[in-house]
Amino acid sequence: MDAFTAMFPELFPIEEGLEDALVGSLSDTSAASASATHTSPASTDTFDDADILAILADAEHWRGGNTTAHGWCVVA
């Protein structure tokens, strides 16, 4: 398990078929984002900024830009 998967396990469904459920309309995405709670990765002091950006870039590339990783990459 990589560090990004460990920080955001809900982005990596175990069951087949759930991947399509993660990519929905903007309202679906907004509702999911509003209800999600995350501890800030920065608050853990576990990863350097360069490490976090590398993790996000890998996740962005792997998922094709259709997940929360894309938003984190834009913010970063």
Swiss-Prot record:
Record's bilayer topology term: Lipid-anchor
Purpose of the protein: Activates B-regulated development.
Gene Ontology molecular function: mating pheromone activity
InterPro entries given in the database record: Pheromone
Pro-sequence residue ranges: 74-76
Subcellular location as annotated: Cell membrane
Entry-annotated residues carrying Cysteine methyl ester: 73
Keywords, ordered alphabetically: Cell membrane, Lipoprotein, Membrane, Methylation, Pheromone, Prenylation
Annotated lipid attachment (S-farnesyl cysteine): 73
Organism name: Schizophyllum commune (Split gill fungus)
Name this polypeptide is given: Mating-type pheromone BBP1(1)
Domain of life: Eukaryota
